[in-house]
Design a protein with these regions (language model features):
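A cross-kingdom feature that marks ATP-driven nucleic-acid transaction machinery
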Residues: 1-125
Length: 125
């Protein structure tokens, strides 16, 4: 139960940082999550740019995990979203508690502190 609580707390912390950045940057982008009827989820979906009615929404997908090592299985929901018609996933980012950042294909994996630094530098959206 402690691990579940810690995971929820970490997601809440990331949500808070996204909300603060959204406000101080005056971007005011929509923040949401993605869930399929089968229960597959992506923690955060952020509008990457203002939506034009003739084009599909462009988004950034973020998955947050309370883990010291990134498991490639956690990429699957973001990849599934990227394959969905009618939406354009511009960036996929994994946030975790490990020590290093790396890239798997088109998914960037960042330690929490690096993610927050990149967020406030305007590098996430």
């Amino acid at each position: 139960a402690d691990r579940l609580w810690q995971g929820t707390a970490l997601e809440t912390l990331v949500y808070h940082e996204l909300r603060v950045y959204n406000e101080v940057s005056r971007k005011h982008r929509a923040l949401s999550y993605y869930r399929t009827p089968a229960g597959v989820e992506v923690d955060f979906i952020i509008e990457a740019a203002g939506r034009r009615s003739e084009s599909p929404p462009r988004v950034v997908a973020i998955e947050v995990k309370r883990a010291e090592r990134w498991d490639r299985a956690w990429d699957k929901p973001m990849r599934g979203l990227a394959e969905t018609k009618g939406i354009k996933v511009e960036r996929m980012i994994g946030v975790y508690c490990g020590p290093r950042s790396y890239q798997f294909d088109n998914i960037k994996i960042l330690p929490l502190a690096e993610f927050v630094k990149a967020l406030f530098a305007g590098e996430i959206y």
